[in-house]
Amino acid sequence: MDQIKKIIDNFKQTISSVDNQKELIVTKNIFVKKHVTPLFQQLRELEELAVKKAFGKELNFLQEAIQELFEEKNQQLVINLDQNQKPAYDLMIPALDLVDGSIHPLNLVVNQIVDFFKKFNFTIVNYPELVTTKHCFDDLNIPLDHPGRSKTDTFYVSDKQLLRTHCTAGTIEAIAAMNKHKDIRVISFGNVYRNDTDDATHSHQFMQMDFMWVNKDLSLSNLKWFVTKFIEHMFGNDLKTRFRLSHFPFTEPSFEVDVECWNCQSGCFLCKKTRWIEIMGSGILHPKVLEAAHIDPEKMVGIAAGIGIERIAMLKNNITDIRDFYFNDFRFIKQFYE
């Protein structure tokens, strides 16, 4: 206990000459790191339980004493500041001109997407980010052994609830609510979550958009035409597109949609030397998905597609690191305008 009292007296003497709050905080942090933290290291190394318990009580007393001295000194500095110093801001100085802000690049992309779907009378829906396994997986024909359902890939809150891994969890709810309509057009967008390690091209949270269009007269040619028009709206009319056969549990057939790289003719870093850039997934809604929404797949056909908002923004603006969108660095954000 003598050692503890010496440390307390030392701290009291150390802060006695401090004359501002910022210096007080820095002084306390340095003192604790130098004199207190090593004692906790010693505590962890003790093996005898009784000795460890007694030493732990002394360290708790030390922490409380240091915090009490810190708060007393801080209160004293506040009083001195009120009595002796002028206000930090001179209200008589004329204000500087306000600088116009700018819209976040992800919101710019969302606005552009919404403009396109409004022209085709789509209903925009927004559902909670906390969803059930029924809406996120079961209704979308995603089997129990699918990797996306594992706890290593998905953020579960309970056995039956999770943070949505795609916006389709909300879109399927929307078409189910409209299942008596002869023509159903729904778009959903918002945050989705995957248990990924954050790096230049991956994020545990990102934005996604998807749409479903259900009608008795739709076909594969309608899907190709509509997706092509969407890509032209987002990237311009001069890009070639291609549809590659793929597999998604909720569509059959399924396609990955690529656009010709606008940065090169023979391969570059952007297209990974392939001359093509993957844009989105699409397909004809699987009959089981329509049945889950209580829609007769013998009478109705659905087309669907989904895309990452960050991916569009990165491709449109040659951004190489997805994390730039989330650092809130105004130097980055102010570059983008409608």
From Swiss-Prot:
Recorded superkingdom: Bacteria
Primary localisation category: cytoplasm
Gene Ontology molecular function terms on file: ATP binding; magnesium ion binding; phenylalanine-tRNA ligase activity; tRNA binding
Keywords: Aminoacyl-tRNA synthetase, ATP-binding, Cytoplasm, Ligase, Magnesium, Metal-binding, Nucleotide-binding, Protein biosynthesis
Gene Ontology CC entries for this record: cytoplasm
GO biological process, one term: phenylalanyl-tRNA aminoacylation
Cofactor(s) listed in the protein's UniProt record: Mg(2+)
Note describing how the cofactor binds: Binds 2 magnesium ions per tetramer.
This protein's name: Phenylalanine--tRNA ligase alpha subunit
Organism, as annotated: Mycoplasmoides gallisepticum (strain R(low / passage 15 / clone 2)) (Mycoplasma gallisepticum)
Gene encoding the protein: pheS
